[in-house]
């Protein structure tokens, strides 16, 4: 798969923390029910305490500096810690109506509560803030440094601020998500014990402001206790995505992301559950498999399966299998779709995710094509992944954002698959996207094909994703430039000939309307835009052309800009200024900016005002930035005041269509009545067959050259090689021949009888009695003392590896990587392990099997292996110790 592949850019908003209302509503929404009594009581208690929680947060916010200062004075010595606290920049609107008196009043309020002043300081000395860690030592400010002081004060202010967030949210989840795991981070820069003491001091200081309100004090202490416990807790391990396949990305999800996401309740059918709990589990299975509670929505159920799973006759895994094989599932999610789309939906319902890779789609597509829906369901339910995630009792659930790490290569398609509208999309998404990874970039807008309007005169008509989904993610990067077709002479395109931007297209392009009387292609000066040499009729023709270019049609009388038309006719404004006023009009804003997404609006405006589609991301991002910071009118000015507009149209020319996309040209050319005679006609070129060209000799060759060429390549020795294959041990002659061939292959000579009798008699008898096969006989020869004495002891490891591949694989080593692999085995485990790795390897089994004696194989791939094998076989075994496959070729031969 290409590393530049794109899985789409579907918008996903991960949940950063949980609140009481969101958690309660999310659980009810997942279970497709109304809020229960306990949840309503929880919400009632939360909203009743809302005023108190806001009061607590406001008090802590107003006295944040004093609280942080008290904590800093507790752990720092030798200076004023509060001077290092950098306050966040406040926006100006937030200061409207505020004054210095109100800020002074907040300080007075803090002191009146007994937390400030002399007595407050004495009280903080004698009050107990909690157990002090034994390793705590005050930190000297001078040695700690200004930079570290700023970071420490910032962190203490951060702890207090997030505590107020959690108090207002009514859920400590925001503290859990953002605090757990900070212990290891702060430990590298500061003392953990000092941080704990500072949090305890802030806890005591915050509680002092609510001594007269027991309920508020209890809330403050509760959330600070959670802050302390979460800070002391070790960093949780990441959630690793499970999967047995080699083509699935091994991804990890930080535990903080998992804690922040909406909790997805998991249901499991256990024997001890009550009847109501079992009904809830069955409904969860219906919601997962059929994407809705069919009992509630359609008054349908599969009663005999429900009774079996309730009574424990079948497991939840078997219940899911039978639901997916039911006629109801087949009718809704299999028959209306082609196999690839039905496969995607089955992944969503049974495994809770979309297909992960192209290989996975191909594997299960083959299953569903050959065995239908039952085979697909069995393959998914019986998979190792299903067993790891759900087992026998758990109902499958959606493993989406926040539940586990998501893959980038199927990001957009998987987010669409999790939506409720997924069954209404008939076009398969995963296989089409995976197939485009290794193809050229498509002819479409860089931010999706849905941003390309139909290239017609009337209005901005964009394809709708709800009717005919056509969006395809494509890996357009910032350096990609879209190919456009110039409407005019090809030599005048602005990419290859930038100086010809102002040249008019003539008869090959659109009709050009100008206000002055110059000839087409004449150089336009700065003051030629106000010429009124034409009469009223020609000026009105230019105005109509301007309306059609900007708006795509003629306007009604009440919609026309009469004042701007009069100024243009009188020469008060130029055509360029007139176009700018049209584009800034309220009608244009309502028609082509407000109803559309910013990307579509910019694309349409660019085609109308500059006469061409946008090139790529750099151009689009530039207009995006202007639109977000300055708005619609700044985008219009950026286009009309650009250098390209000045070069192409100047001050007196109405913009016209200069470039088309290939898709737009094809759409226009395919219309009835627009086909030319030279389109659609097949022209066959007479081409000489390639085999005829290759058979022709271009040069005159002499007899010595012909003889040399005929001797190139593999010799006839390969055709004359005799292969010894032991089919039956009853044929003693064949057994004897195979044994002799094995001696010649391994030892490169026939062995004397006395050597055979002393060392190999046992091996020969075992082979003759069919106790071992030829492969084991070869391995026994390689691990014998004779082989070790002849080919292992006298040579270095690299030479041993060369001779080993020659004797047991019939070739020279492939490359240095193979030599390194065998060298590691030989050095760490010895000769027997080296011989075993070759003889028991897949290459040996595929080439020789268990009953064939190894032989010279004449390998041709890789290219360097053939001459290396040739040299290895043509030289005598003990001729020299020079390597055939060296790691490098020396520049100067030493000792020559």
Swiss-Prot record:
Its EC number is 4.-.-.-. Contains one covalently linked bilin chromophore. This protein autochromophorylates. Residues 247-427, 508-684, 703-881 form the PBS-linker domain. It is found in: Cellular thylakoid membrane. (2R,3E)-phycocyanobilin binds at residue 190. Pfam families: PBS_linker_poly, Phycobilisome. GO terms for cellular component: phycobilisome; plasma membrane-derived thylakoid membrane. This is Phycobiliprotein ApcE. It comes from Synechocystis sp. (strain ATCC 27184 / PCC 6803 / Kazusa). The lineage of its organism: Bacteria, Bacillati, Cyanobacteriota, Cyanophyceae, Synechococcales.
């Amino acid at each position: 798969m290409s590393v530049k592949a794109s899985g789409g850019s579907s918008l996903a908003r991960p949940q950063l923390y949980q609140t009481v209302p969101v958690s309660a509503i999310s659980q009810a929404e997942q279970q497709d029910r109304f809020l229960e009594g306990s949840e309503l009581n929880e919400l009632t208690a939360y909203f009743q305490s809302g005023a108190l929680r806001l009061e607590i947060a406001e008090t802590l916010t107003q006295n944040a500096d004093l609280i942080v200062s008290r904590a800093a004075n507790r752990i720092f010595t030798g200076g004023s810690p509060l001077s290092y606290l950098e306050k966040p920049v406040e926006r100006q609107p937030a200061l409207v109506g505020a004054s210095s008196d109100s800020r002074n009043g907040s300080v007075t309020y803090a002191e009146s509560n007994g937390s400030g002043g002399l007595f407050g300081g004495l009280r903080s000395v004698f009050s107990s803030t909690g157990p002090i860690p034994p390793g705590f030592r005050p930190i000297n400010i001078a040695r700690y440094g200004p930079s570290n002081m700023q970071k420490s004060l910032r962190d203490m202010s951060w702890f207090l601020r997030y505590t107020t967030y959690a108090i207002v949210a009514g859920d400590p989840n925001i503290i859990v998500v953002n605090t757990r795991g900070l212990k290891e981070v702060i430990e590298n820069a500061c003392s953990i014990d000092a941080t704990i003491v500072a949090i305890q001091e802030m806890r005591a200081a915050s509680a002092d402001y609510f001594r007269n309100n027991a309920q508020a004090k209890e809330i403050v202490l509760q959330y600070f206790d959670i802050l302390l416990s979460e800070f002391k807790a070790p960093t949780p391990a990441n959630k690793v995505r499970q999967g047995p396949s080699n083509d699935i990305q091994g991804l990890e999800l930080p535990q903080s992301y998992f804690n922040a996401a909406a909790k997805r309740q998991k249901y499991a059918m256990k024997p001890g559950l009550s009847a109501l709990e079992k009904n809830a589990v069955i409904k969860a299975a219906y919601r997962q498999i059929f994407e809705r509670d069919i009992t509630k929505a359609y008054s349908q159920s599969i009663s005999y399966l429900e009774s079996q799973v309730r009574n424990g006759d079948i497991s939840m895994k078997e219940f899911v299998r039978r639901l997916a094989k039911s006629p109801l599932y087949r009718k809704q999610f299999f028959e209306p779709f082609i196999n690839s789309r039905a496969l995607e939906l089955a992944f969503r319902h049974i495994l809770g995710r979309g297909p992960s890779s192209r290989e996975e789609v191909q594997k299960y597509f083959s299953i569903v094509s050959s065995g239908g829906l039952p085979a697909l369901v069995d393959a998914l339910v019986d998979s190792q992944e299903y067993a790891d995630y759900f087992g026998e009792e758990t109902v499958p659930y959606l493993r989406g954002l926040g539940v586990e790490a998501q893959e980038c290569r199927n990001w957009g398609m998987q987010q669409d698959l999790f939506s409720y509208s997924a069954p209404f999309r008939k076009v398969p998404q995963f296989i089409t996207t995976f197939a485009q990874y290794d193809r050229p970039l498509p002819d479409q807008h860089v931010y999706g094909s849905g941003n390309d309007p139909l290239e017609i005169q009337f209005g901005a008509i964009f394809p709708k994703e709800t009717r005919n989904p056509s969006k395809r993610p494509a890996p357009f990067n910032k350096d990609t430039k879209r190919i456009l077709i110039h409407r005019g002479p090809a030599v005048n395109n602005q990419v290859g000939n930038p100086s010809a931007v102002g040249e008019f297209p003539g008869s090959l392009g659109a009709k050009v309307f100008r206000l002055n009387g110059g000839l087409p292609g004449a150089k336009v000066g700065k003051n030629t835009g106000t010429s009124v040499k034409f009469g009223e009729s020609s000026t009105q023709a230019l105005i109509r052309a301007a309306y059609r270019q900007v708006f795509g049609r003629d306007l009604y009388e009440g919609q026309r800009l009469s004042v701007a038309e009069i100024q243009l006719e009188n020469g008060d404004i130029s055509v360029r200024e007139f176009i700018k006023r049209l584009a800034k009009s309220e009608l244009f804003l309502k028609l082509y900016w407000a109803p559309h997404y910013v990307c579509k609006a910019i694309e349409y405006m660019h085609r109308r005002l500059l006469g061409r589609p946008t090139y790529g991301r750099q151009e689009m991002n530039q207009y995006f930035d202007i639109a977000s910071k300055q708005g619609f009118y700044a985008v219009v000015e950026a286009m009309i005041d650009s250098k390209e507009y000045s070069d192409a149209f100047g001050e007196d020319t109405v913009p016209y269509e200069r470039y088309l996309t290939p898709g737009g040209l094809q759409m226009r050319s395919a219309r009835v009545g627009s086909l030319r005679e030279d389109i659609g006609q097949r022209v066959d070129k007479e081409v000489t067959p390639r085999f005829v060209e290759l058979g022709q000799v271009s040069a005159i060759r002499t007899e010595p050259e012909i003889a040399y060429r005929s001797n190139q390549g593999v010799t006839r020795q390969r055709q004359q090689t005799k292969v010894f294959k032991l089919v039956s041990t009853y044929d003693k002659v064949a057994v004897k021949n195979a044994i002799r061939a094995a001696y010649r292959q391994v030892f490169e000579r026939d062995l004397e009888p006395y050597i055979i009798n002393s060392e190999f008699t046992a091996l020969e008898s075992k082979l003759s009695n069919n106790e071992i096969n030829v492969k084991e006989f070869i391995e026994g020869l390689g691990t014998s003392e004779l082989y070790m004495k002849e080919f292992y002891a006298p040579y270095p490891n690299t030479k041993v590896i060369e001779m080993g591949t020659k004797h047991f694989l019939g070739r020279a080593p492939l490359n240095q990587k193979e030599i390194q692999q065998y060298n590691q085995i030989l050095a760490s485990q010895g000769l027997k392990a080296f011989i075993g790795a070759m003889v028991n390897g897949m290459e040996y089994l595929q080439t020789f099997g268990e009953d064939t004696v190894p032989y010279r194989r004449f390998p041709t791939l890789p290219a360097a292996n053939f001459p290396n094998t040739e040299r290895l076989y043509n030289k005598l075994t003990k001729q020299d110790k020079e390597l055939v496959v060296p790691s490098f070729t020396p520049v100067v031969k030493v000792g020559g």
